[in-house]
Amino acid sequence: MSGWGSLQHRYESVEPRKILALDGGGIRGVLTLEILAEIEKQLKVQLKKDDTFRLSDFFDYIGGTSTGAIIAAGLSLGMSVQKLLDFYEKKGEAMFDKVFLLKRVKYFYNDGPLLKVLKETFGSRDIDLKNGSFKSLLLIVTMIRSTDPPWPISNNPNAKYHDPGRPDCNLRIPLYQLVRASTAAPYPFGQGILT
């Protein structure tokens, strides 16, 4: 279990695990965040925590798809719900920028602004799944476009594609690309490419 880093003790001793699963829905992620803000607030009171408390302190595994992946990545890195709400309120319009009518045959939103915001938020190449910045496990659900099966990607060091010896190891993929791939529902944004 050496790949767990500073989280190793937490995952060896905590039972049962607490999992937070977040759905997609584009800019409606703001609604999800409003609900999470209330959960975070109530947990602070119930657990007698101060303002440094984050949902990643409570949930062992945070996962999501599409806009849920954006939120899950932020929470897993220890961002407060309020910071993510501010992020959606300031960047939401740019992230979900509709494309010119004639291009809607392929996709509904322009992914350029989204990609720019994801790079700014999750780093261009400095944050990936082997990065020690995570406060909880993260699961991002994407799909393989050519065959359509779901592709769950996690920072769990016991995950199948977490072995650095594998040519298809997920550890080398920057976080912003993983999140972008999850937002690539076939029509809203077009496909995301992992490098």
Predicted feature residues:
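Terminal, contiguous helix-loop blocks that mediate binding/assembly
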Residues: 3, 10, 57, 186, ...
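Patatin-like phospholipase
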Residues: 4, 16-21, 27-121, 154-165, ...
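Surface-exposed acidic, glycine-flexible loop patches that form ligand/cofactor-binding
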Residues: 6-12, 50-56, 123-136
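A short catalytic or substrate-binding loop motif that flags glycine-/basic-rich loops and adjacent residues
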Residues: 13, 23-26, 131-134, 143-145
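Intrinsically disordered, low-complexity regions enriched in proline, serine, glycine
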Residues: 84, 129-131, 191
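Active-site gating loop/helix substructures
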Residues: 96-97, 135-195
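Short, glycine/charge-rich beta-strand/loop segments that flank catalytic centers
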Residues: 104-106, 133-138
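Active-site periphery "cap/insert" segments of enzyme catalytic domains
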Residues: 112-135, 148-152
